[in-house]
Each structure stands twice: as structure tokens, then as C-alpha cells.
Amino acid sequence: MKTRVRGLTLLLGSLAVAVCVAADANMGTWKLNEAKSKLNPNGPKNHTVTYAAAGDSVKVTVEGTDSSGKTYRSEWTGKFDGKEYAVTGDAMSDMRSYKRIDDRTLEFTGTKGGKVTITGRVEVSADGKTRTVTATGTDAQGNKGTSTAVYDKQ
């Protein structure tokens, strides 16, 4: 009996986490709308971001082509709790944190070698069809810049 209760409790807890993650406005695949975005001339092309459930965390995968035509892919898995989690494949950051502001808004910070390299805000529209990312950062050459990237839900 105790085993059944524990099993049921674990199952319900897992389902609750899955429902919360699935209900998150950021979840899904987002494609960059270059025409609506204000990006650095050296910014990404053919850029896609996917948010997917990964247990009780979220996995964010970024894929695309840079301005020189080189393809890239980065991954981050963590929680929207303001704590830093490792990033792979990102030239600007090796750690990133996301903090939930409300149901449709996140703030993020990326660091490289312990120094902040990028900060920004992610906002999903009320209808859930558009995602806008405003970011300020410093690249490897020390150049500072601000961008606004608009994404369409796929």
C-alpha cells in the first residue's frame, strides 16, 4: 500500500511538473523574423530557437547560420529560477540564467569566464504567436551592442 501511495505521489508530481512546463508560453519552436527584427549587421540568419521539456527543467536549443554562412548550435538546460546553468556551443557565454518575471516574460543573463557578456528580456505576445527578445551584450572583440529579435511561433 505504501509503495502504491509513493508511486502515485511521484506520478502526480511528475505530471504536475509536465503540465507546468507544457503550459509555459515559451515552449515550442520559434523562427527568427528578420524583417521585424533590429539586429547587428553580423547577427544571425535562419535562426531557430526551441524550448522543450527536459524532466523538471527546460532545454533551449538554438540553431542557425551566422552572417558568414557558418552553421551553429547551442544548448542550455536548466530552470527559470535565476540560477546559472551551463551553455554549450555559444561563443558569447558558457553559463546562462533565466528568471521568470510573469507568465509571458523572462529575463536572462549570460556570462563567460564569470563576466557578464549579455543581458536581456524575452516576452511572448498575449496571443502566443510572437516572441520578442531584447538583448544588450559585448562580443569577444569588446564591441557593445543592442538588438531586438522577433520570432514567430512554428
Protein language model annotation of sequence segments:
Residues M1-L12:
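Bacterial N-terminal signal peptides that target proteins for export
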Residues G13-A22:
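Hydrophobic h-region of N-terminal signal peptides that target proteins for export
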Residues A22-Q154:
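Hydrophobic small-molecule pocket/channel-lining residues, especially in calycin-type beta-barrels
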